[in-house]
């Protein structure tokens, strides 16, 4: 059976999603992006769609087509079309009363209808889904703005047919967003009003829906077909053109390439300012060899766009007036469109409704595709009883894990894992003869536990005396369908066990905090990875030094090593250990160099001794350092020890 998908065919970006295994998956494209630009470009040699088309738009403006959604299903003499055509860098001409787009392709002049251009974008979305699902995709639910008339809807359906899709249904974008939040399920307490605030890349739509037992009625719509993220980008671009002029006495406003590079940087800065209070822009050789380095704060950005931001409230008032209801009668407000990530917009909307909580837990640029995928699953009968009830509660919103040596967050359940789920890993002790371990449970995306949220902790004591790395402690995380987490620890030698239960409300984060943490985590990811690598290098050096110490003092080996060698090696080990104690904040490179130094002393001595013992050749990797795969291998030792200093055996992470 072919799989059904939901496609949000947007003015500037499109998105595709699929419903399977009781959850919706937003499908990323070959660039790893979860939304794909609705761009098609024609060159001398090829046709490009999506990111590849948008990326070359600056070099090839006349043959790069976008905003086809503004033309689809309209007549050439439509005032909207006439107005839009003035601003497009590509040619729009009249063909039998309809607008068609004229481009140069492989050396010839070609014309394409808006339906054909949209069908190319839909084909791209279909291919993205097929690449991920590994099978043909035929059936799709495609979304359109609520104000689209019959001919625009039919033209969109035709675009789907051209793309080889069986369009199951054309549904309204606000309806799809409401379905995504399961608002059709919220209590069958008769009709309730839902306001959908959709601020996208190029358009702004506000819709008021009345939902009654799964029936959606569009009560009123309003908006601005020319207000969106691109306008905010323009304000930034103009601001920086002036700044460049002030600093360098040069005007870049006529140089297309410089403008395109500046616009790309501005779009990126705008996105960053949704999660951080300021950001920097660095463009090498922007114009006539001059580098442009500057920064902008969130406050300044909000000031530059203040009138645009405020103007988004006018259509909200209009929709309420048209539907003849008071704002206190609106039960749910749903944010859709990437531009609703802007904190100031969220605040304006919330304040307008007297501080009401907004629905924004689904990525705003994905909510429409999400709802379309649910609708597609329902229409193809590809659902389960569970679907209907816990459509949106079926993933762990943040990674869950425990703290291991060095304050490192070791994740057992990664974020977005489908729940219920169960996962076990084996850990060991950090010090010789350690009597107990403290199991601390955290949620969050950062590499160090201090940056994450502590959910609870418990002690597992009564571990019999043993060298570090020998005891095996199995930690199990188990989340049930209600999101309640049970964490247990079992010491395999004695069978001792301890557990803790963490319920949803106790110490868990709110949705807003989750969104904030996830966006911060992206920002900090690089620093985090560096820090994790540094701690890993430190732990590896420490483990190596201690396992060497065990090796030369262990019964079989100590007789094989000459007194001089033993003294030399012991001195090197002790120096390394005391250097480690004094150098907790050294760099990855320093730890690695120190390890190499120690290896250069140890390897010849150990291999000589192994030769004498007739054991396995190679240096004592002993039990390798922490990090990598926690496997619970017992401590290193005699001639059967791992070969080579860089042992390839499983690594054991240690719990303080």
UniProtKB/Swiss-Prot annotation:
KW Protein biosynthesis (keyword) present: no
A molecular-function term among this protein's GO annotations: ATP hydrolysis activity
Region feature Disordered, mapped onto this chain: 608-656
Induction, as annotated: Induced by heat schock. The promoter contains at least three heat shock elements (HSEs) that are bound by the heat shock transcription factor (HSF), and one stress response element (STRE), which is an upstream activator sequence (UAS) that causes transcription activation under stress. Expression in repressed by SSN6. Expression decreases after exposure to ketoconazole. Expression is also affected by farnesol.
Primary location: cytoplasm
Compositional bias per record (Gly residues), positions renumbered to this chain: 611-647
Residues with the N-acetylserine modification: 2
Free-text function comment from the UniProt entry: Heat shock protein that may play a role in the transport of polypeptides both across the mitochondrial membranes and into the endoplasmic reticulum. Acts as a highly immunodominant antigen. HSP70/SSA1 and SSA2 bind histatin-5, a peptide from human saliva, and mediates its fungicidal activity. SSA2 facilitates fungicidal activity of Hst 5 in binding and intracellular translocation, whereas HSP70/SSA1 appears to have a lesser functional role in Hst 5 toxicity.
Family: Belongs to the heat shock protein 70 family.
Designated name of the protein: Heat shock protein HSP70
Gene: HSP70
């Amino acid at each position: 059976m072919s799989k059904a998908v939901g496609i949000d065919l947007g003015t500037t970006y499109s998105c595709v999603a699929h419903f399977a295994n009781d959850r919706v998956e937003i499908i990323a494209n070959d660039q790893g992006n979860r939304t794909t630009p609705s761009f098609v470009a024609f060159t001398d040699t090829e046709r490009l769609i999506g990111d590849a088309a948008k990326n070359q738009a600056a070099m090839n403006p006349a043959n790069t087509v976008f905003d086809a959604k503004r033309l689809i299903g309209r007549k050439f003499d439509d005032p909207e079309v006439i107005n839009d055509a003035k601003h497009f860098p590509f040619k729009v001409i009249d063909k039998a009363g309809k607008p068609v787009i004229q481009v140069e392709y492989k050396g010839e002049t070609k014309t394409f209808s808006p339906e054909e251009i949209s069908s190319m974008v839909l084909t791209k979305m279909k291919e993205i889904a097929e690449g991920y699902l590994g099978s043909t995709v035929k059936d799709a639910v495609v979304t359109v703005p609520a104000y689209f008339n019959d001919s625009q809807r039919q033209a969109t359906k035709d675009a789907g047919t051209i793309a080889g899709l069986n369009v199951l249904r054309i549904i309204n974008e606000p309806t799809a967003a409401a379905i995504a939040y399961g608002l059709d399920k919220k209590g069958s307490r008769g009709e309730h009003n839902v306001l959908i605030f959709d601020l996208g890349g190029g358009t702004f739509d506000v819709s008021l829906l009345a939902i009654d037992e799964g029936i959606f009625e569009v009560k009123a719509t309003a908006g601005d077909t020319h207000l969106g993220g691109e306008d905010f980008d323009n304000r930034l671009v103009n601001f920086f053109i002036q700044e460049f002029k002030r600093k360098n006495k040069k005007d870049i406003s006529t140089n297309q390439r410089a403008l395109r590079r500046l616009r790309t940087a501005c779009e990126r800065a705008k996105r960053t300012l949704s999660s951080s209070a300021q950001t920097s822009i660095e463009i090498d050789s922007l114009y006539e060899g001059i580098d442009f380095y500057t920064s902008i704060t969130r406050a300044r950005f909000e000031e530059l766009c203040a009138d645009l931001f405020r103007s988004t409230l006018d259509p909200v008032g209009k929709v309420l007036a048209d539907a003849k209801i008071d704002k206190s009668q609106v039960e749910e407000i749903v944010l859709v469109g990437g531009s609703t990530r802007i904190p100031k917009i969220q605040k304006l909307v919330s304040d307008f409704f007297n501080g009401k909580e907004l629905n924004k837990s689904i990525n705003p640029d994905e909510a429409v595709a999400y709802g379309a995928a649910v609708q597609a699953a329902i229409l193809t009968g590809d659902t389960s009883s569970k679907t209907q009830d816990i459509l949106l509660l079926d993933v762990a919103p943040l990674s869950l894990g425990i703290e291991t040596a060095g304050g490192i967050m070791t994740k057992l359940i990664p974020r977005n894992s489908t729940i219920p789920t169960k996962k076990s890993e084996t850990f060991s002790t950090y010090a010789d003869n350690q009597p107990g371990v403290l199991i601390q449970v955290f949620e969050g995306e950062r590499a160090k536990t201090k940056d994450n949220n502590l959910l609870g902790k418990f002690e597992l004591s009564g571990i019999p005396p043993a060298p570090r790395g020998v005891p095996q402690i199995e930690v199990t995380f188990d989340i049930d369908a209600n999101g309640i987490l049970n964490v247990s620890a079992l010491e395999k030698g004695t069978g001792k066990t301890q557990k803790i239960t963490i319920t949803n409300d106790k110490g868990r984060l709110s949705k807003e905090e989750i969104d904030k943490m996830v966006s911060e985590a992206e920002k900090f990811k690089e620093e985090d990875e560096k820090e994790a690598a540094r701690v890993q290098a430190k732990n590896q050096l420490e483990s190596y030094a201690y396992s060497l110490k065990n090796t030369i003092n262990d019964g079989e080996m100590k007789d094989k090593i000459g007194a001089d060698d033993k003294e030399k090696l012991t001195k090197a080990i002790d120096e390394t250990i005391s250097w480690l104690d004094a150098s907790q904040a050294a760099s990855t490179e320093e730890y690695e160099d120190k390890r190499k130094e120690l290896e250069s002393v140890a390897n010849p001595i150990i291999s000589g001794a192994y030769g004498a013992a007739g054991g396995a050749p190679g240096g004592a990797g002993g039990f390798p350092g922490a990090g990598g795969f926690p496997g619970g291998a017992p401590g290193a030792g005699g001639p059967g020890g791992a070969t080579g200093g860089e042992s390839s055996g499983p690594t054991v992470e240690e719990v303080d």
